[in-house]
Each structure stands twice: as structure tokens, then as C-alpha cells.
């Protein structure tokens, strides 16, 4: 409500259904309004909590360390992701927790490190600067989905990223790096699946 004090990581919006995610405050401060605001990717107004930051970035008490990945069960990992409100970055905001529990068996996870457009370097920089986080995340996905193998796909014009990720997976038996030709639209998911796995996703089907 208006006037409430909130902290970083505090839940300020509950998930309203299965295909939805909770919202958390990214700052500490005071709620100054609850009103419709333009959504960044939807192009329409949604109800928003407007917070005036106090500049302190004080963490909420609910933000606590979890058990190690080896100690967590697949269901516990999915619940953590769900409660954290993690969603995809493709614009639709699809809840990641739903993808971590596929309806059908999955044998391979493809980590798409190919840019979606020529001259972009977003995925390239993520691979270079967050390599350990990527490996950790892929381990978590393999555990929750039950997939036997994780393949990190990188275009051949990113040699430094290729070398770094190959070094990271060298002693991990269920991970490997696939070097793909730098060719548009290599980053499109169905194109990538056919290139790496030799499998064709049917028209209208989802990978």
C-alpha cells in the first residue's frame, strides 16, 4: 500500500496463476503510488507499484542463502526459481519454473550462445563475464529436467568465449561446447536444434 516501506528482494506482487510469476522490489524505499504504468515489452498499461528509493539498497530479511545445488532436490530448485519470480528475457516474460518441469522426457539441453542479429555482442559478453554462473545454471537445469547432456552452442567468431567455455566444461562429463558457423539466423531456436541435433521441430511445434 502507499506509504509502506519496502526492501530489496521483498515480494510486492503475488503470482495470479500457473503461467505467472511473483514480483519483487529491486530497491529499498517507500511506496508512493499503486497505479497503471506502461509495461516495457507489452506495450500496454499494467498495474505497477511505484517506489521512491532511499538509496540504501537494504536487503529484505527473506533474502537468505540456500543449500548447495548438490543438496537441493529438483522440486526444491524449481520452487526457489518460482518464488524468485525468474522469467525469460525474450519479451513474453514466460515463467522459468514452468520450463524446468517439462511434460515430456528431455534428453538434451541446448544453451543458446548465438546472437539473434549480426553485430550484436550481448550473448558474447555474458559468456565471457558470467561463465561460472552459466555452468551453475546449466547444472541446475540438467538436474531439474533429468536431461543427460547439456550443450553450449557458440558461433565460431567468438573464439575467446569458445576457449573459455571449453576450459570450464573440460572436466564435466555431461556438458560440451558446440561451435556453430556464424550465419544468420543461427540463433533461432528451431534452426539451432536442426544444426546441432539434426532434429526438425514440426510446424507449429515447440522445442
Regions found by a protein language model. Give the residues of each.
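Hydrophobic alpha-helical positions that pack around
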Residues: 148-207
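Short, well-structured beta-strand-loop connectors
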Residues: 2-14, 33
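Gly-rich Lys/Arg/Thr-decorated short loops/hinges at beta-loop-alpha junctions or inter-strand turns
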Residues: 57-61, 109-123, 203
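Short, Lys/Arg- and Gly-enriched loop/turn segments at beta-strand edges
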Residues: 14-26, 40-44, 59-61
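Acidic low-complexity segments
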Residues: 33, 38-89, 94, 103-104, ...
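Histidine-anchored nucleotide/phosphate-binding helix
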Residues: 128-145
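Conserved hydrophobic positions within beta-strands
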Residues: 29-31
